[in-house]
């Protein structure tokens, strides 16, 4: 029997696939466009094509579905709300219903962007969502769609997912951009007025499987203990690679003209997941240390 991972070519999906395989699980993955480089069954599938997904669940006798597929381009969602709703809202509910009918676990990932960011503290799972852009609204629709049809589903909210890919071990996203720009000796403008609790993909994958083993359901926040701005984050990356800190320039969100609004402070409280598993979520320093090998290409 297999674990079925949607979005296997994304950062999070690729790390989930790797972590499952490292723990001895058979995996079948789906991807939307570019095929990842895993030695396991992989299929190009549109996540909104529920009929095709069901065919794969039957073909591989799947006994676990982890939905990593999402439309995560925040500004793209603002311009394409119908696509955002279909991928982030409707499709997760359809998958959750299929899993409920088959009585197999369903795990779905959501986002800190379901909150408006108008807080000076940390959001708990039970706090009232109030998304301020189409991306957050579509992800909240997905949460409701999943919960309405599958009360046993596990929904994990994440914040600013980053890390190294599961298939190639290459650093991607924000840390790769910061590290490569600093290594090239160029300036890096980073926001000082946005605060989040970044979720390292490797920790998310490990925590996901720990929660699965614990047999829990409901909504949990999985993120760093550390509340940081992009500027703070960049400074820590600079320390890791031995870069020139004077290249980091302060910036604010208003400096960029972007279609979608971003929450000012979308920090996630991780007390519930820590209490459930009996261990702490990592600090940013812990997470960056776990990526030491991936940063080595940019170290001076």
UniProtKB/Swiss-Prot annotation:
Disruption phenotype: Impaired formation of the tetrasaccharide present at 'Asn-532' of S-layer glycoprotein Csg. No effect on 'Asn-47' and 'Asn-117' glycosylation of S-layer glycoprotein Csg. GO terms for biological process: protein glycosylation; S-layer organization. It holds the Pfam family RmlD_sub_bind. Belongs to the dTDP-4-dehydrorhamnose reductase family. It comes from Haloferax volcanii (strain ATCC 29605 / DSM 3757 / JCM 8879 / NBRC 14742 / NCIMB 2012 / VKM B-1768 / DS2). The active site is at 135 (proton donor/acceptor). Keywords: NAD, NADP, Oxidoreductase. The lineage of its organism: Archaea, Methanobacteriati, Methanobacteriota, Stenosarchaea group, Halobacteria. InterPro entries: dTDP_dehydrorham_reduct, NAD(P)-bd_dom_sf, RmlD-like-bd. Pathway: Protein modification; protein glycosylation; Cell surface structure biogenesis; S-layer biogenesis. It is an enzyme of class 1 (oxidoreductase). One of its GO terms (molecular function) is oxidoreductase activity. It comes from the Archaea. NADPH binds at residues 11-12, 46-47, 70-72, 109, 135, 139. This is Probable low-salt glycan biosynthesis reductase Agl14. NADH binds at residues 10-12, 46-47, 70-72, 135, 139. Reductase involved in N-glycan biosynthetic pathway that takes place under low-salt conditions (1.75 M instead of 3.4 M). Participates in the formation of the tetrasaccharide present at 'Asn-532' of S-layer glycoprotein Csg, consisting of a sulfated hexose, 2 hexoses and rhamnose. Involved in the addition of final rhamnose (sugar 4) of the tetrasaccharide on the dolichol phosphate carrier. PANTHER family: DTDP-4-DEHYDRORHAMNOSE REDUCTASE, METHIONINE ADENOSYLTRANSFERASE 2 SUBUNIT BETA. Its EC number is 1.1.1.-.
């Amino acid at each position: 029997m297999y674990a079925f991972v949607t979005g296997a070519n994304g950062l999070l999906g690729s790390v989930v696939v790797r972590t499952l395989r490292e723990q001895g699980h058979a995996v079948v993955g789906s991807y939307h466009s570019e095929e990842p480089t895993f030695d396991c069954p992989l299929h190009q599938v549109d996540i909104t094509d529920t009929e095709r997904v069901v065919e794969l669940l039957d073909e591989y006798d799947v006994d676990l579905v982890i939905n990593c597929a999402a439309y995560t381009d925040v500004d793209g969602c603002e311009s394409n709300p119908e696509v955002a709703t279909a991928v982030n809202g409707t499709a997760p509910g359809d998958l959750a219903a299929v899993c409920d009918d088959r009585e197999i676990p369903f795990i779905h990932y959501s986002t800190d962007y379901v909150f408006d960011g108008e807080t000076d503290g940390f959001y708990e799972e039970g706090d009232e969502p109030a998304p301020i852009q189409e991306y957050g609204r579509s992800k909240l629709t997905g949460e409701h769609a999943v919960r309405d049809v599958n009360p046993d589903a596990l929904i994990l909210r994440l914040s600013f997912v980053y890390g190294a890919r599961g298939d190639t071990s290459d650093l991607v996203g924000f840390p790769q951009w910061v590290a490569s720009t600093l290594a090239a000796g160029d300036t890096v403008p980073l926001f000082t007025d946005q605060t989040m609790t970044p979720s390292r993909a490797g920790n998310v994958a490990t925590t996901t499987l720990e929660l699965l083993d614990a047999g829990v359901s409901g909504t949990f926040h999985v993120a760093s203990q550390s509340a940081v701005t992009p500027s703070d984050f960049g400074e820590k990356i600079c320390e890791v690679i031995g870069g020139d800190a004077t290249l980091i320039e302060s910036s604010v969100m208003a400096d960029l003209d972007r279609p979608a609004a971003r929450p000012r402070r979308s920090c996630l409280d991780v007390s519930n997941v820590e209490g459930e598993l009996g261990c702490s979520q990592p600090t940013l320093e812990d997470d960056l240390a776990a990526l030491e090998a991936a940063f080595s290409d940019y170290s001076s």
